[in-house]
Amino acid sequence: MSMLCYTLIIAFLIGIWAAPKSEDNVSLGSPATPDLSDTSCAKTHEALKTSRNTDQHYPAPKKAEDQEFGSAANIIVDPKLFQKRRFQSPRVLFSTQPPPLSRDEQSVEFLDNADSLNRNIRAKRATHPVHNRGEFSVCDSVSVWVANKTTATDIRGNVVTVMVDVKLNNNVYRQYFFETKCKNPSPVSSGCRGIDAKHWNSYCTTTDTFVRALTMEGNQASWRFIRIDTACVCVISRKNDNFG
């Protein structure tokens, strides 16, 4: 009888020792910790909700091709880049306002004010004044300021990105190019004006030259020589019927 009592007492003590002492020692995956899983799910749901709200307030980023030309205005140019500039051309101007054209379109004047990064430059396009005595140009040309040039061909023949707007000292400057083109390849029915059509073939064509402009190379601004239209000239060739 005593042996049976001892056996029951030992079984009771073993059962007490085998029971869990607290919920702190229970593994995270057990049903004893539903608060952790519920909290995690609640946080995940809240994060997804916040992400959806953020997408509604902030539009999706644009594609790379859409940012190719717009990103140039966001690049801040170091002022030292203009101090190191060489081979300045009177046909390239940085200004916050459209540059003026002279009344007779024979000269180009850059104003030396706070809105311009260029020095006071005046380029004469005529060596003598034009008198009203029937003087005409061989070819008719037109000169304009180009304010939206985005691409150009550099001196190596590669197509480069031209910076339209330049951010410098908390100001945005527009890069202008003074270009000259032919109005008409044939000012007269025979070709160029004043050419003997009996012995010569002639036509007017636009020629170009290289000027130093601010371009983009990766995410940095750099000076490069690019090609722009600068003149209208007459091309002549002797007629074949004169030979023989």
Curated annotation (Swiss-Prot):
The keyword Cell membrane does not apply. This is Venom nerve growth factor. Belongs to the NGF-beta family. Glycans are attached at N148. It is found in: Secreted. Residues 19-125 form a propeptide. The keyword GTP-binding does not apply. Expressed by the venom gland. N-glycosylated. Nerve growth factor is important for the development and maintenance of the sympathetic and sensory nervous systems. It stimulates division and differentiation of sympathetic and embryonic sensory neurons as well as basal forebrain cholinergic neurons in the brain. Its relevance in the snake venom is not clear. However, it has been shown to inhibit metalloproteinase-dependent proteolysis of platelet glycoprotein Ib alpha, suggesting a metalloproteinase inhibition to prevent metalloprotease autodigestion and/or protection against prey proteases. GO terms for molecular function: growth factor activity; lipid binding; metalloendopeptidase inhibitor activity; nerve growth factor receptor binding; toxin activity. Residues 1-18 form the signal peptide. One of its GO terms (cellular component) is extracellular region. Keywords: Cleavage on pair of basic residues, Disulfide bond, Glycoprotein, Growth factor, Lipid-binding, Metalloenzyme inhibitor, Metalloprotease inhibitor, Protease inhibitor, Secreted, Signal, Toxin. Homodimer; non-covalently linked. GO terms for biological process: cell surface receptor protein tyrosine kinase signaling pathway; modulation of chemical synaptic transmission; negative regulation of neuron apoptotic process; nerve development; nerve growth factor signaling pathway; neuron projection morphogenesis. Disulfide bonds join C139-C204, C182-C232, C192-C234. Transmembrane segments: none annotated. Pfam families: NGF. On the 2D-gel the determined MW of this protein is: 17.5 kDa. InterPro entries: Cystine-knot_cytokine (IPR029034), Nerve_growth_factor-like (IPR020408), Nerve_growth_factor-rel (IPR002072), Nerve_growth_factor_bsu (IPR020425), Nerve_growth_factor_CS (IPR019846), Venom_nerve_growth_factor (IPR020433).
